[in-house]
Amino acid sequence: MPGKRDLCMRFFCGLAAVVMVVAAAAGEPSAPDQVVAEAGWKYRVVTRNLPGIDNLVMALDGSLYATQELPNGAGKVIRLRRGGVTVVATGFSRPDGLLLRGKFLYITEEVPEGRVLEFDLQSKKQRVLATLHNPEGIDTLPDGDLVVSEDSINGRLLRVRRNGAKAVEVILGGLNRPEGLVAKPDGAVIFAETATGRVLSYKSGEVNVVVDDLDEPDQVEIAPDGSLWITEDTRDGRLLRLKDGALETVLSGLRSPQGMAFGSDGSVWLAERGRQRLLVIHGEDSR
């Protein structure tokens, strides 16, 4: 029969295990912060308690818009400014992709019959531009139309017109879970093909591999200096930068990092959904 000391040790070990399981189920870290900034980089936590935080866009006034990808009409778009959080729009089902153009926000709902929405920041009115299968990534093509990805096994890149025409045009099909994307001024579309671990480029009927051997690449963004930033949506995810043909890790140990945005001061803003928080990253050498 075990002694009192052994029984106490077993009790406290079991209690610790229960606490860890409950914390994991709640989406909170069960261990101290394990995010590692590589040499030359530093980060800090700006805002906490942002469940489902996903994609980000930076406004000209320095405020940040973000989607909170919550299901069944609980999803919302919020505005973060000087530490404050304001709800901009609600009633969405898993709002994911986010784009800001002038007074309009464009939002995608990542559900089987997900809407691509245009939301007027001034009038607060919205209209449905298209209904697609798991729409996620969104950006503007050089001619003003939208390009949207469908996050599915037989996924597509689609052209969605902003003029109210309901018809959509297939740009590229047969993809394996395309997610985040960015359109370049020359018409090329850079996108993450999550299931294959690749970032691809599509232009004029030609597909090229930009980066491969990644672990569930999720979002991609092009910084003002032309470098390509990538997040890996895993429990031990990374924030990556591709510059001048060299891929480097900026942060590791992230929990499901999602969207990025760039500040006018060279900062990088990052949604870390797994820890329900917003980070800001700076290069220590001001690069």
Put a short name on every predicted segment.
Residues 2-15:
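Bacterial N-terminal signal peptides that target proteins for export
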Residues 13-23:
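Bacterial N-terminal signal peptides
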Residues 24-29:
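Boundary at the C-terminal end of the N-terminal hydrophobic targeting segment
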Residues 31-50:
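A short helix->beta-strand "capping" segment at the edge of beta-propeller domains
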Residues 42-47, 84-89, 124-130, 166-172, ...:
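A short beta-strand motif characteristic of beta-propeller blades
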Residues 49-61, 74-75, 91-109, 113-115, ...:
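Beta-rich, blade/repeat-based domains predominating
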Residues 68-78:
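Beta-propeller domains
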Residues 80-84, 119-124, 161-165, 202-206, ...:
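Short loop/turn segments that connect beta-strands within beta-propeller blades
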